[in-house]
Amino acid sequence: MNKIGKAMLCTVLTGAMAVGAAGAADLGSLSPQGAKAYLNQITTLQNKYGKAAARTDDGFKGLLTGLSMAKLVDMDGDKIPELYCGAGLDGQHMYSYADGKIYALDIPEGVSNFATDVSPCADFYVDDTKAYLVDGHEIMNGFPVRYLTKQGKEIVTALTYTDAIDDDTGNHICTLNGESVTYHELSAAQVNFT
C-alpha cells in the first residue's frame, strides 16, 4: 500500500455557510445534484443538532454543540467524495451519493475524540486511492481501534488492533485483526498499512 497521510478533522466554531464551505474543498466528480443533496443533508443535520456554538452555561463552558464538522472525503477512491459530519461527541454521520440519491453509511455515532472534550476530532488516514476513518483511540489503552473505509455501498473494517500495557510486567499485549502479535509485529503492520 502507498504511504498515506494522517488528517485530523477538528471542530471549529462555524455557522451554516461555513459548515457547507468546509466540505466543498474538493468536489471531485460529484455532480451538482450530489453537491445539492449533501448541502441539504448538512441543513437537515443542523436542524437536528443545531448550528455550531460554544456553550456558555454551567461547568461545560466552551464545549462545542451543534453541527461543527463537515468534510468531503473520498473513502473508496472513486473520485466521488463522501460527506462526513460530526455534531458534538455522539453525532458522527457519513453519507454517499450514487444513482441520483444520497444514502447514509453505517459508521459509529460516537466521535473518537483525539483532542479534548471541548473540541472533539475525527481522525482519517488518506492516500490517493482510499481514506480510512479511525474508530477508537490510538493510544495504549487496550480498547479496539478500527480503520474503516468504504467498499461498494458499505463501510467495512480494513484493520483492527488493540494495544495494552500489562500492569505487572509493563509489556505490551497486542492483537492485530483478532490474532495475538508482539508489539514489534503490530508496529511493523501499522507502518506497512499507513
Where are these regions (language model features)?
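Bacterial N-terminal signal peptides that target proteins for export
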Residues: 1-9
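Acidic, small-residue rich beta-repeat scaffolds with periodic aromatic anchors
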Residues: 5, 26-36, 48, 126-194
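Hydrophobic core
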Residues: 13-17, 21
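Terminal domain-start segments
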Residues: 25-73
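Beta-propeller blade termini
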Residues: 66-75, 118-130
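Acidic/hydrophobic-patterned starts of short beta strands in beta-sheet-rich repeat architectures
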Residues: 76-86, 127-134
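Beta-propeller blade repeat segments, especially FG-GAP/WD-type strand-to-loop junctions
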Residues: 92-107, 145-151
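Short coil/turn segments at the loop-to-beta-strand junctions that recur within blades
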Residues: 109-113
